[in-house]
Regions:
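Non-heme di-metal
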Residues: 2-190
């Protein structure tokens, strides 16, 4: 692959059939990744199957994910900022709970599948929560509140478990030297 030539081609992709094909390829590879991961989990449960089979499903799933990443990179979506990714995620979740799942549930109900309709409606409720979460995270990023709060919070280092109470996460963990990006507000819900 010639990086310079690829960059040039990427500039001309917008609105082309090739761009559509890349999105379709991304969707197909993404679906294969999930499908093979699930197949691996099922193979591990089956005492009649070799664990090697599960490992091969996992290996292939990893390959499919790598393929999906290539196609997603080519359409430029991986080059966007994290804030843009959060907005894209919120938009996608919004479409799922406001349009896709309600339509699918209605079709399932009309065709005599009330349990499937029920599940689709419940999944739509979860997608709404996902949208809310992404919007809150985006607001934190835009308002520079990801690592700084108005009140003291208990921050925890995801690497070593160090905690401190402060309005702001440490720039660096004083125990393991991991950067601020490893800190989150400690949430105990047990």
């Amino acid at each position: 692959m010639n990086e310079v030539k690829i960059q040039e081609e990427m500039k001309r992709l917008k609105g082309t059939e090739t761009e559509k094909n890349l999105y379709h390829a991304f969707a197909g590879e993404s679906m294969a990744h999930v499908k093979y991961t699930l197949f691996a989990q099922e193979a591990r449960k089956d005492p009649e199957m070799s664990q090697q089979l599960a490992d091969i499903f996992d290996e292939t799933a990893k390959n499919e994910r790598a393929h999906a990443k290539i196609w997603f990179w080519l359409v430029g979506d991986l080059k966007k900022t994290t804030a843009e990714h959060l907005q894209m995620a919120a938009d996608g979740e919004n479409d799922e709970w406001t349009s896709m799942y309600p339509k699918f549930a209605e079709t399932a109900k009309k065709e005599g599948f009330p349990q499937i309709a029920f599940l689709m409606n419940k999944i739509a409720e979860i997608e709404k929560q996902h949208e809310t979460r992404y919007k809150m995270l985006l607001a934190n990023v835009e308002n520079e509140k990801l690592f700084k709060k108005d009140e003291k919070k208990l921050w925890i280092c995801a690497n070593c478990g160090f905690t401190c109470e402060s309005v702001e996460a440490p720039v660096e963990c004083p125990v393991c030297s991991h950067p601020r990006s490893f800190f989150a507000i400690k949430a105990e819900n047990y």
